[in-house]
Amino acid sequence: AAETIIGEGEHRFRVQHHFPQLPDRFTWQTTHGVAVDAAGNLYVIHEGQKELKDHPSIFVFDPEGRFIRAFGSEFQGGGHGIEVRGEGNEEFLYISAYQGVKCFAKLTLTGEIVWFRKAPMEAGCYAEGENISTKPNWSRQGFLPTNVAFLEDGGFLLADGYGSFRIHRYDKDATWLSSFGGEGEGKGRFQTPHGIWIDRRAGREPTIVVCDRAHDTLQLFALDGTYLETLNGFGLPANIDTSNELMLVPELKACVTILGPDNTPVARLGRAVERLDEIKNLRTQPDKWIDGQFVHPHDACFTATGDILVAEWVQGGRITKLARV
């Protein structure tokens, strides 16, 4: 088949939809997150159907997309966010899970649990018993964490993107310290703060970037949580990654955007927003998906060589590799 190339200028990519191959014994049940380790291996988390309890939620592939291993049935039914962090000579996975699983955890790259945490009741914003409940609570008194971002001191930030709409700060031992945000109309308040990242690109003070998804914006904060500014012009931005001078923004509205050093778009990849309007529930109809067009990008990350991996919130799952041309 002819190659599909998308992008513009210096940012052109060869599209490989359905890049990693799952063994027949597993199925993708709504892919949610992607991350890569130092060796270039790919980690994918899917939500998973809670009825299929013994099915893994995390899948590992080599840089060519060949299956290595799977684990994480404890997150099945709520698997959401995944990030890889180097700590000394080791690397670890940080997992966020929502729905009835509603927890976050630190794992080794082979799936052993280092620690496992539920709602931080000391934050004072959660319903009684939220840390032991296994029913999703979609109110602002619920805990439904979506993604994490890593701080220099070994601690991290956790976005409670579907629950309290707060950003929680933890130390390196996963002890809760403080939080900021909550529900509101912007400028430090959120509607679905779904994604989070620390922007450490050169030539600027490090900033916290929060995907304020339902407002179609990115909000920027100083590392102490002080609100700085808002970037507009997105379509349900879901998460963030950075590499060199670029920032990557997967948008649920059928687009993966690359921002340059001044945070203006330098490429909008696979954008097909009109198609979402034309075809109801396109996410459930793979026969209507078009090569080189996205449906619902939910997470994306750069590889060390500047390729991009994209996870889409679609039925049956889809992980696309965009190989730099």
Role assignments for model-derived ranges:
Residues 1-325:
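Eukaryotic scaffold repeat domains enriched in small/polar residues
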